[in-house]
């Protein structure tokens, strides 16, 4: 190939365009100009391609206007009612079709460029959540997918419909979607088969239970998801080689590729999967050299080529971002780095644009002073412009003469369409300046190039908006201005060498907004849009058609480039055609391959090599294969191969050098690695595990730890040394050595991030798993407690509640101030003063709330007077303009799942009243069942509400050491309650023996009180429910103990006289030590005894179940602490130690077959006290950490590594020799429970309580304002957890009636489908489903009970203040026991509690006060003492009482 351009690759593009050499006289003196005036801005202006027909959208009036003469005259489109246009969509593959989308089901379409419009029904309402409403088929314009929503219920469910005949008929495609696309969504993409190209559809499907994006999956159907024999015809593609992936959040079509992005809990790192046929997918691999990751909101898929994908990944602070640009190989899988320090803005736009019509050329802006910007986030960027002619292999400066030119690009968009170029061959324009770097836009001039950017010249002074016409023979520009002072347009007929001006008619002066023309830039007609004074908007039609008489002929044509035009082609809507010619390959046609970097003209290995499929399967590290030489042909390069050896010929490589290289053979041994923490005087540790997500590319197991000790008064001392390990405790090093760290706060949702506060306003943080550390200045002093609150979706959004002091009337007054940052602390804005706490309550999952919603508890006035009541305020715009007081006289609030629970004063009852809200704006009270009187001195505890209902514990016995209560269960919106379990045990602080089992929906363990013994102690029994608390049973006892000795009693299923009873939540030293683990479905451990009731813990033995509590067996004598590993294939037990009883040992016990056999492993030569055993919270690691103290007082950790036991990965469950067995619960599930004011009678039927009435229609419709209808009460209601469909629906066997005022909607629903009625009536809060996932991300696996109404400090100098549980006046406790996760899809759970207290005395403090205290761990140390923080944890907020205000 011949080289064209500086440093160009070896191909040449010949563009047959125009060349003119003669001069003709203008027919007229200038263009014809016509002005039209409008009251509102003409937005979304669109040409029908290859025509003069233009449409625009008046969004103020919701009307569409049309012009058929390139903007000269305008009128509203015919056949469409006024005020219905929600959006305007142009057909992507048919230049005569467009759609007017309304906010209803009836829309309008045109097939004749808008001349006439026809109504059509989309079979679904327009989605308000999705940008892309219509998805078009690239091969058949009649095939369209409509992404809509079904709002038959209170909340809207996203659905997709489709048509194969241009909406003559629309059919349902799929429900519960997050977007659907045709496989053939690009003209270049093909599945390889014509029938699949025509039919294949891809949908992102929401989980049937979980509303969270981490549970979404990709589904493919070739017959529109139809059912055959009751089965939906769909399949899940093997995104990750041999299995599907959950967490699919987006799909993009890029030329001939489909890209799918997935996410997972614990991290914002995403995985990108690529296919070029929808069948074979690959995970996009980025070079290992610099550790670049694709994070949510931090990557941009650029305009790709026909033969590769280009991606820019942000790698710096979000407030002043820069990126790295990568280009893939030809199948879109392996990316190599093209350019570092690309210029980006906060919206993800990248200063990058390809030159239109010419492959391989693009302009990009980079940051020259990148080191300063990385170090100091507020530094001004010095932006420079570069160009490449070989698709990013080499880059060059652009120059005007000898002066370097820098141009404003995509991050400063000043017009519609492309920034620099158009289909006009070789013509490029831009606004910029000469010099060392890019100046402000207002200081720029207009520059032009007619050789595709190889050379430039200044065209006009000042910044301009510009366009190309007549395939480049005409350039038009209008000066840019912030004022309405522009009264002329400029134009050039010689590629910008000379310019003329034309004045706007009648002395019109305007502020230019856009200038545009046809998409192919072949027209001589342009449209200028501008504004002048007030609400005057002008559409100016410019027609240069009469400017010259001569039309270009064949002898005016030559190979591009062509200049000095004095004729017009006048071939409107005919595009220039590029031709290519291939030459012999040279070094310039090759670049470094994946994980190779260029050095001294060679490509050196900088990371693992990719082996061909099957090359290193079952191979040893020294096995060799033919692999990459380090070079690859530049994607898309079609050079002719010469004879002989090639630069990219495969060479010999070793399997030890490849990605996922073979593991060394298993040794069969467990290894123990000890690390002594020298000079440590304290006796405990704060431990923070940085959990990984499924989409994480890291394989480390990082733990952060520091020594701590709790004083008798509850305060905590900490050592200043903070330690880090990246290999689960084999090696430790000290971090932040010179800093006096005060508090350590893991990010509640994104576990790669941890924040460290100091005694000053300096805050350190890491976002890459403690690899690197950055700092920011907080807006106020940290005060006591956790000052930070995090957003569930936006990693960089922070709320800081700190202490501010100022002089008021000569006296210093201190208060808490809430500040908000949207760029991870680089910039702060004050939200509220005199605030108690604030939380982000907006979330993408809860579509009924604004993503920006914040709820705060603050004082009504800005003072600290005792009579200053507290109020709940909310905002949907960060308190910039929106600030609404929602409730007054509030004591506190707590968030749990989708509920916001508020405790407010009830002055009539002289106590507290509880309210709840779903949307953060409307709060409603709850109704308790008949005969359940609630004293104002009672305590309320909200238990885990993960299964579509609130479990509310109400204390009924208040005597100290005898406290107990009833668990009431709500309907799905938390307003009416029925009895679930009476006489449930709680401690003196109203923490409850209640736990939902992780990994299985609906399985709950409680301890109930059956009386007193002779000493006056409570007699407790353990009960279990397998249908979310509707029915309870005792635990069946094993027949014999671990030694084979029979117990003193026996029972097949467990009964009052003989059952297994377990020590529960209230007796745990560490409130996070749960019975089960996230990744181990059905497996539970506990210690207790066999008999008629629970015995002393000193006499307890250890038991386990592998079937979720159906059967149990004894595994150890005495009480042992357990830890799960490798998804339950490893369980480790250690003797339980307490402060009073230090169990000493030098070995641990473990099983690798679910407790069938147990082995001991000696980890120490002398006996030591094991303070704790920890591992990754989900139970997926094969490493464990023992935290020990020796007899001579040394504190140390021991890593136990079980990876040596085996090197064989488990075989696929579907294979014949599978290592898995299919397990499913066998307990019968009841799908119904008693309704409000109904209870089980002696015949186990739900009967109306004597003297009471069922929930009335008026009450139901009032409490559910969006409900359309109600059923006459039958006595039954569905368990909110159940997902059953059809069958015996006991709540719907009665007659349905419309709510008042909803008669018309009722009739429409009744005529639509039973499914619609189901959603409208049965599930009034829709997406309350499966909030167990919410816990996994919101509250991780923290099982510490959140004490509402208390304040405590996690900092070493902040006392743990103990607050009362019950006051004489009133006490209401709202305690959140955080949710469990479903077996197949759910990963972890939590049982943390939150309590809203009215004040009083007594009670110990478990958590830190002030705002969202997220303590650290899954394992804590002593009763009444604080939990240590693990990254998984979210201890929730302490809902403070009045004494919290002391700051």
Curated annotation (Swiss-Prot):
Residues 1426-1447 are annotated as: Disordered. Residues 1336-1364 are cytoplasmic. Disulfide bonds: none annotated. GO terms for biological process: Golgi to endosome transport; Golgi to vacuole transport; protein targeting to vacuole. PANTHER family: SORTILIN RELATED, SORTILIN-RELATED RECEPTOR. It comes from the Eukaryota. The keyword Ligase does not apply. Belongs to the VPS10-related sortilin family. The chain crosses the membrane at residues 1315-1335, 1365-1385. This is Vacuolar protein sorting/targeting protein 10. It is found in: Golgi apparatus, trans-Golgi network membrane; Prevacuolar compartment membrane. GO terms for cellular component: cytosol; Golgi apparatus; membrane. It comes from Verticillium alfalfae (strain VaMs.102 / ATCC MYA-4576 / FGSC 10136). Residues 1430-1447 have a biased composition (Acidic residues). It holds the Pfam family Sortilin_C. Keywords: Glycoprotein, Golgi apparatus, Membrane, Protein transport, Receptor, Repeat, Signal, Transmembrane, Transmembrane helix, Transport. Glycans are attached at residues 306, 331, 864, 973. Residues 1-26 form the signal peptide.
